[in-house]
Swiss-Prot record:
NCBIfam families: rbfA. It comes from the Bacteria. InterPro entries: KH_dom-like_a/b, RbfA, RbfA_dom_sf, Ribosome-bd_factorA_CS. Its main location: cytoplasm. One of several proteins that assist in the late maturation steps of the functional core of the 30S ribosomal subunit. Associates with free 30S ribosomal subunits (but not with 30S subunits that are part of 70S ribosomes or polysomes). Required for efficient processing of 16S rRNA. May interact with the 5'-terminal helix region of 16S rRNA. Belongs to the RbfA family. Gene3D superfamilies: 3.30.300.20. Monomer. Binds 30S ribosomal subunits, but not 50S ribosomal subunits or 70S ribosomes. GO terms for molecular function: ribosomal small subunit binding. GO terms for biological process: maturation of SSU-rRNA. It is found in: Cytoplasm. It comes from Buchnera aphidicola subsp. Cinara cedri (strain Cc). PANTHER family: RIBOSOME-BINDING FACTOR A, CHLOROPLASTIC-RELATED. This is Ribosome-binding factor A.
Length: 116
Protein backbone atom coordinates (compact mmCIF):
# COMPACT_ATOMS: atom_id res chain seq x y z
CA UNK A 1 0.00 0.00 0.00
CA UNK A 2 1.28 3.45 -0.88
CA UNK A 3 2.09 5.75 1.98
CA UNK A 4 0.03 8.93 2.07
CA UNK A 5 1.83 12.21 1.64
CA UNK A 6 2.66 13.90 4.90
CA UNK A 7 1.48 17.39 5.69
CA UNK A 8 4.94 18.81 5.15
CA UNK A 9 5.17 17.27 1.67
CA UNK A 10 1.78 18.71 0.71
CA UNK A 11 2.80 22.10 2.06
CA UNK A 12 6.12 21.94 0.16
CA UNK A 13 4.21 21.29 -3.05
CA UNK A 14 1.81 24.17 -2.40
CA UNK A 15 4.66 26.54 -1.58
CA UNK A 16 6.49 25.40 -4.72
CA UNK A 17 3.53 26.28 -6.93
CA UNK A 18 2.61 29.55 -5.25
CA UNK A 19 6.15 30.93 -5.00
CA UNK A 20 6.73 30.15 -8.68
CA UNK A 21 3.62 32.10 -9.65
CA UNK A 22 4.53 35.01 -7.37
CA UNK A 23 8.07 35.27 -8.76
CA UNK A 24 6.89 35.15 -12.37
CA UNK A 25 3.87 37.46 -12.08
CA UNK A 26 4.26 39.73 -9.06
CA UNK A 27 7.94 40.61 -8.79
CA UNK A 28 8.56 43.61 -11.02
CA UNK A 29 12.26 44.18 -10.46
CA UNK A 30 13.98 45.00 -13.79
CA UNK A 31 17.17 43.30 -12.56
CA UNK A 32 15.29 39.98 -12.62
CA UNK A 33 15.43 39.70 -16.39
CA UNK A 34 16.23 35.99 -16.30
CA UNK A 35 13.75 33.14 -16.30
CA UNK A 36 13.82 31.91 -12.69
CA UNK A 37 12.86 28.30 -12.05
CA UNK A 38 12.14 26.80 -8.66
CA UNK A 39 13.54 23.29 -8.52
CA UNK A 40 12.56 22.32 -4.99
CA UNK A 41 11.20 23.60 -1.68
CA UNK A 42 12.35 21.96 1.56
CA UNK A 43 10.61 22.72 4.84
CA UNK A 44 12.13 22.41 8.28
CA UNK A 45 10.66 19.87 10.68
CA UNK A 46 8.63 22.51 12.53
CA UNK A 47 7.45 24.13 9.24
CA UNK A 48 8.86 27.53 10.21
CA UNK A 49 11.67 27.71 7.62
CA UNK A 50 11.67 26.91 3.92
CA UNK A 51 14.68 26.59 1.63
CA UNK A 52 13.69 27.48 -1.91
CA UNK A 53 16.11 26.03 -4.44
CA UNK A 54 16.21 28.03 -7.65
CA UNK A 55 18.03 28.01 -10.93
CA UNK A 56 17.96 30.44 -13.83
CA UNK A 57 19.07 30.61 -17.42
CA UNK A 58 22.05 32.48 -18.84
CA UNK A 59 23.67 33.36 -15.52
CA UNK A 60 26.64 31.17 -14.74
CA UNK A 61 28.95 33.65 -13.06
CA UNK A 62 28.87 33.91 -9.28
CA UNK A 63 28.45 37.68 -9.23
CA UNK A 64 25.10 37.60 -11.06
CA UNK A 65 23.96 34.62 -8.99
CA UNK A 66 24.64 36.58 -5.79
CA UNK A 67 22.82 39.64 -7.14
CA UNK A 68 19.70 37.68 -8.06
CA UNK A 69 19.72 35.77 -4.76
CA UNK A 70 20.04 39.09 -2.93
CA UNK A 71 17.09 40.55 -4.81
CA UNK A 72 14.96 37.52 -3.99
CA UNK A 73 16.08 37.51 -0.36
CA UNK A 74 15.13 41.20 -0.05
CA UNK A 75 11.69 40.41 -1.50
CA UNK A 76 10.93 37.62 0.99
CA UNK A 77 8.68 39.85 3.10
CA UNK A 78 6.57 40.70 0.06
CA UNK A 79 6.51 37.07 -1.10
CA UNK A 80 5.48 35.89 2.39
CA UNK A 81 2.66 38.44 2.53
CA UNK A 82 1.30 37.20 -0.80
CA UNK A 83 1.69 33.59 0.36
CA UNK A 84 -0.29 34.43 3.49
CA UNK A 85 -3.21 35.52 1.29
CA UNK A 86 -3.10 32.36 -0.85
CA UNK A 87 -2.19 29.62 1.63
CA UNK A 88 -3.93 29.73 4.98
CA UNK A 89 -1.32 28.99 7.62
CA UNK A 90 -0.92 30.15 11.19
CA UNK A 91 2.71 31.03 10.45
CA UNK A 92 4.06 31.42 6.92
CA UNK A 93 7.57 29.91 6.82
CA UNK A 94 10.60 32.17 6.57
CA UNK A 95 12.05 31.81 3.08
CA UNK A 96 15.70 31.29 2.20
CA UNK A 97 16.63 31.24 -1.47
CA UNK A 98 19.49 28.94 -2.48
CA UNK A 99 21.01 28.51 -5.93
CA UNK A 100 20.61 24.90 -7.06
CA UNK A 101 23.76 23.58 -8.71
CA UNK A 102 22.33 20.16 -9.61
CA UNK A 103 21.57 21.23 -13.19
CA UNK A 104 25.12 22.47 -13.77
CA UNK A 105 26.53 19.34 -12.13
CA UNK A 106 24.32 17.15 -14.33
CA UNK A 107 25.50 18.91 -17.49
CA UNK A 108 29.12 18.54 -16.38
CA UNK A 109 28.70 14.80 -15.73
CA UNK A 110 26.93 14.34 -19.09
CA UNK A 111 29.84 16.04 -20.86
CA UNK A 112 32.31 13.79 -19.06
CA UNK A 113 30.38 10.69 -20.08
CA UNK A 114 30.08 11.92 -23.67
CA UNK A 115 33.85 12.43 -23.88
CA UNK A 116 34.65 8.87 -22.82
Amino acid sequence: MLKDFSRSMRLERSLYKEIAVIIQKNLRDPRLNSFITITEVKLSYDLSYAKVFITFLNYDDKKNIKIILGILQNATGYIRSLLNKKIYLRIVPKLFFVYDTSLINGIFISELIKNI
